[in-house]
Amino acid sequence: MTEQFDSKTFLKTVTSQPGVYRMYDTSGTVIYVGKAKDLKKRLASYFRAQVTSRKTESLVKNIVQIDVTVTHTETEALLLEHNYIKLYQPRYNVLLRDDKSYPYIFLSADKHPRLAMYRGAKHFKGEYFGPFPNTHAVRESLILLQKLFPIRQCEDSVYRNRSRPCLQYQIGRCLGPCVKGLVSEDEYQQQVDYIRLFLSGKDQQVLTRLIERMEQASQQLKFEDAARYRDQIQAVRQVTERQFVSGTDDDLDVISVAFDAGMACLHVLFIRQGKVLGSRSYYPKIPTGTTLDEIVQTFLGQFYLQGSQNRTLPSEILLDFTLPEKDILSDSLSEISGRKIHIQTRPRGDKARYLKLARTNATIALSTRLSQQSTIHQRLDSLTKLVKLAKIQRMECFDISHTMGEQTVASCVVFDSNGPLRSEYRRYNISGITPGDDYAAMNQVLRRRYGKALDESKIPDIIFIDGGKGQLAQAIDVFQSLDVEWDKTRPQLIGVAKGSDRKAGLETLFFATEDKSIALPPDSPALHVIQHIRDESHNHAITGHRQRRSKVRNTSTLESIEGVGPKRRQMLLKYMGGLQPLRNASVEEIAKVPTISYALAEKIYNALKH
């Protein structure tokens, strides 16, 4: 415990009411946030003569100040605690690494409702179905739904400005409500009702209604309509047969935890209307010495209470562990949602099967993660010995990407001792250089990256430069000329050059501190970690360059065609439904656009293709 903090004097002033406390270090940074039913009793426990936890011992040594906020109830304290954790990200708290809001399928409340993926606060009128574990699951579902129930998925701006049906109508993926006369209001609303029932888990009602429609069409001798309903029935049946359904309309989150070697995996199974929407594994950042109870309690608080306004909470949460403050969490979630939310730890029947499934997934996911971490640490140890450092905590790598010198993008990727830190990846648009001058591009990105104040924790131990001696020379020149307060001599500069035929495994390393190069054997663990960070940087640069190039092309391709002015550009995009359908169109299809002659259509076709 530091001499600066007088715990005895402080504790005399603390109330015994419920509330939240924030602990600060010498720099004024919040290092821990906690809550208590009795603030005085809880805070006194940190300053006992004997502290059994290594984590608590380390925490107390760094405390120089404590602030408390009194609340009316424990529930208020729990909510405030997790708001503070999200705000301050204290290093001694268990931190959920990914607190993005979850994606939903959104059915709008328009005259002709649209189906779309949505993430964020629910400001728009309509219905939200989910949550889904990730955007990929939503996109897959939207593709499937478009095949089953062809209602529109286009943006309102496109829908309102159409005079002819787009490609989705032509291939049977949309009924074309944008064009009058293609579909009746009743028929479109039918499909919307089917989607609403289907997403609510009422598959049998959908099938019953479709069968009634098919029989009705057949009796009226409308055989084409009957055949269409028949195909739709078959498609819905194929989908429902593939789904694991509990036979009930359960809305559940099923959570299991696996804990080993200082790492935890919490696996969440999302079940809505009796259907498994998907699952996701979480690996929270855990301070050394943290107990499993604290890991679980903090994870659940952050998972459900942070960003709860954007989330549809389930009616029940199943856990495979005893929760010390189960009632407080249940009351808090019930208060937020406006309905009772139950937390169960000993379910039976189908619910017990769900819990067993989550437990199996948590165990497998943690085992896989530990295996990967072991491999990463072995490779990092090998690299540490190669570069003769005591330890490596942070590495950064740079690459340049462009096409014939145009739309040049530089990438910077960051690795720590556990692998990629993707949240810290950055891209830099390069400008003001001679097109194609990779040396100047590298010089510019390094000056922009390092020619400013850096926190001690952000100074890399190694900087890899994708390139040979020339690129490394640029890095050396930049660092020699830097006028900064942080230790610019700390990072080791290493150039990574591929062999003459640019095959992986034939890389040559150039060191700024030594006038020699090294070619590591292909099976070298150190080489593998270098290849990994170099490939990440390369891919990050290429992706950024392609996005920048695509953006430029999308706005400039049509503008560069002689005879295509603003009005014709607008007509082409409006008639074809956007640039991508226009790219895919034939000369004959382009020539059907009003004011576009066949000769001009050929010119447009060739410009877009070449």
From Swiss-Prot:
It is found in: Cytoplasm. InterPro entries: GIY-YIG_endonuc, GIY-YIG_endonuc_sf, GIY-YIG_UvrC_Cho, Hlx-hairpin-Hlx_DNA-bd_motif, RuvA_2-like, UVR_dom, UVR_dom_sf, UvrABC_protein_C. One of its GO terms (cellular component) is excinuclease repair complex. Coiled coil: none annotated. Residues 16-94 form the GIY-YIG domain. One of its GO terms (molecular function) is excinuclease ABC activity. Pfam families: GIY-YIG, HHH_5, UVR, UvrC_RNaseH, UvrC_RNaseH_dom. Its main location: cytoplasm. The keyword DNA repair applies. PANTHER family: UVRABC SYSTEM PROTEIN C (PTHR30562:SF1), UVRC/OXIDOREDUCTASE (PTHR30562). This is UvrABC system protein C. It comes from Photorhabdus laumondii subsp. laumondii (strain DSM 15139 / CIP 105565 / TT01). The gene is uvrC.
